Amino acid sequence: MLPPNTTESQIIANVGGGDMTTGSCASVALAYIGNKCGYDVCDFRGGESMNFFSRRRNLQEIVNSVGGVLESDVNDFKAAARLLQTIDVGKEYYFFCAKHAAMIKKNDNGEYMYLELQSAVNNGWKAFNQNVLKSRFGAQKSHTIYGQKTKLSAGLIDSELLANDSGFVDMLKYINTEQNKQRKGKSGSVK
């Protein structure tokens, strides 16, 4: 367990790092929520855990199991916009869309922010807008498979739903990695 006086900045420094391995965005955001709940969780895993969190359908199952919201559309921007409309000011949410997952929130002034946790040097809350959705999340206006338009899901979970879910601690155990078994992505560092 983390000391009760652990600050958000300390949590971001603890879980953030230059890990860009497949699926690490999805699990590091969950590790952040775990740390906010007081658990000492680091996310530098490999093997089956890495594969699990890189699959959209697994993220969809997590959203469904805890009572989050899914939106499907051929246009990622439209799906994201519908999800963003449901965000309450001051609350934090687990959000995935297109090729990325992150924590997201809306400030008192109505601005959306996302939590960068994969940078080797510059983690923290950043402005979230259409440009970020395109460049950081990889959002597209249309998805096709073999020439046919295809809908993809985007998901949103109130972090309090996750924190209160009976299976969340088990998920954190799956993410948490013993120091001698940690696998780092390019530019990752030991935490």
How would you describe each model-predicted region?
Residues 11-12, 33, 62, 87, ...:
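Weak global preference for isoleucine
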Residues 8, 26, 55-59, 77-80, ...:
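Short amphipathic alpha-helical segments that mediate assembly, nucleic-acid/protein binding
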